[in-house]
Regions:
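Mature, structured domains of secreted/extracytosolic soluble proteins
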Residues: 1-314
């Protein structure tokens, strides 16, 4: 609380007593936040969930007092878009991890965002920025920056439309988690193959890469290809599996018309795009596969779900 002097004491009323003071008393968190990044979060009604989260884990003062920071600030709608409507399910440790994943340790205006598209957060892990036509910027393939360069005394805010969540594991771990989901489980065939003794070396090779892209056939894709796969040798099935991963962290916006992607088995897949959105892959059998879900982000890469199994030259 700030200081104020009592200038008239003991003014009696029917339901209490009044002491007049010569200044407005402010809670300490209001006083130290004025003019800072924290002020925007505290006093803008669009950021009430973010403000509550920062206060819950005692990070509000940090955001107000640390100099030269950049905050990618999710508004209330951004939390809802990420499926977060309450903070009740978060431990303080998890909430701190999520919040610090939204902060860079330098003042970075929109014109200064790294050309390479990689920025390290205070949480310690990187975020990945994609620069699209018309000046649009995506983070980790799914979150868009919708307002930029709100400058305050100790840093700058960019408002985002979806809360950032640090990846829960590498892309093999994430595929396994999706296969074991309580609702909408998928990729069970793919992950069972990767977990088997026969192909665990492929899973290990994927895990070992720092930047890799996995085109993951869903269960329906494997069912549709069961006749073909049943006639393959174990070595040929291994060749099929390595034909679904490529080196490099390629988000959907990195997949462009006419591109040839070299897979881990050294064979290529051709990319076709329709209206810059629909992505179609053509394998060595000239069969076409649709990318049906994009930018599932992992610690060492990204997953795109596909609706057919890619078949290489065998």
């Amino acid at each position: 609380m700030n200081d104020a002097t009592v200038i008239a004491a003991d003014i009696q009323s029917v339901n209490g007593v009044i002491h007049a003071v010569d200044g407005v008393l402010l809670p300490s968190y209001v006083e130290y936040s004025l003019g800072t990044v924290a002020e925007v979060v505290l006093f803008d009604s669009d950021f009430t969930i973010l403000a509550a989260a920062l206060r819950q884990v005692d990070l509000l003062e940090t955001v107000a007092t640390v100099n030269d920071i950049t905050v990618f600030a999710p508004d209330n709608a951004a939390f809802v878009a990420a499926g977060i409507t309450s903070l009740d399910g978060f431990s303080d440790e998890d909430l701190t991890t999520v919040l610090t994943y939204h902060v860079l340790g330098a003042r970075v205006l929109s014109t200064q965002l790294p050309e390479g598209g990689i920025a390290e957060t205070l949480e310690g892990r990187n975020i990945y920025l994609g620069y699209l036509f018309g000046g649009r910027v995506l983070i980790n393939g799914l979150t868009e920056i919708k307002a930029v360069d709100i400058e305050k005394s100790n840093g700058v805010i960019h408002v985002i439309d979806r809360t950032l969540v640090p990846p829960a594991g590498d892309i093999v771990d994430i595929a396994i988690a999706l296969a074991n989901a309580d609702e909408g489980a998928d990729f069970t065939v793919l992950t069972s193959l990767l977990a088997s003794d026969e192909y665990s070396d492929i899973a290990d090779a994927v895990r070992a890469q720092d930047n890799i892209t996995l085109f993951a056939p869903n269960d329906a894709a494997f069912e549709a290809a069961s006749g073909v796969i049943a006639g393959l040798t174990p070595e040929e099935i291994g060749e099929v599996l390595t034909y679904h991963a490529s080196l490099g962290r390629n988000f959907s916006y990195d997949l462009v018309q006419g591109q040839n992607i070299t897979m881990l088995n050294a064979q290529t897949v051709n990319v076709t795009t329709i209206n810059g959105e629909t992505i179609i892959l053509q394998d060595k059998s000239a069969d076409e596969t649709n990318v049906i879900q994009v930018n599932i982000h992992g610690s060492n890469g990204v997953i795109h779900a596909i609706n057919k199994v890619l078949i290489p030259n065998l």
